[in-house]
Design a protein with these regions (language model features):
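A general structural-boundary detector
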Residues: 13, 46-47, 76
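A boundary/linker detector
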Residues: 1-35, 80-109
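Short linker/helix segments within small regulatory modules
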Residues: 42-56
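Short Cys/His-centered divalent metal-binding micro-motifs
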Residues: 56-81
């Protein structure tokens, strides 16, 4: 199966990340040891869109993903990822801010 841009989806519905090409380290801190988790940049009703458009990164489990300074417990970190995801999508797919908002539901920049 492929997304509308021709990118092959994994069996779990993930297109290749447009935000991180090397998945061997944490996107935020660069950690290479310990558990690394996939993190969809836009969650909730947009989780499947994050997967389909490659708007996901790898985060270290104990720190940047679920730690007190991690994306799930720090609104500033979450907003930064949202902005970076929007910029990546606009560059990769040629979307305008309006096109992004129509697809994801909110403009983050």
């Amino acid at each position: 199966m492929r997304n509308e841009y021709g990118e092959k989806l994994s069996r779990n519905g993930y297109a290749p990340s447009i935000m991180q090409s090397d998945l061997s380290y944490c996107y935020r801190c660069g950690r290479t040891t310990g558990k690394l988790d996939f993190h969809e940049v836009y969650g909730g009703t947009n989780r499947s869109k994050s997967k389909r458009y490659g708007l996901w990164v790898v985060l270290c489990h104990d720190g940047c993903h679920l730690g007190t300074w991690g994306v799930h417990y720090n609104a500033e970190v979450m907003e930064q990822l949202h902005r970076e995801g929007q910029i990546a999508a606009m560059e990769a797919y040629g979307w305008t801010e309006e096109e992004f908002r129509k697809r994801i539901g909110k403009n983050y920049i």
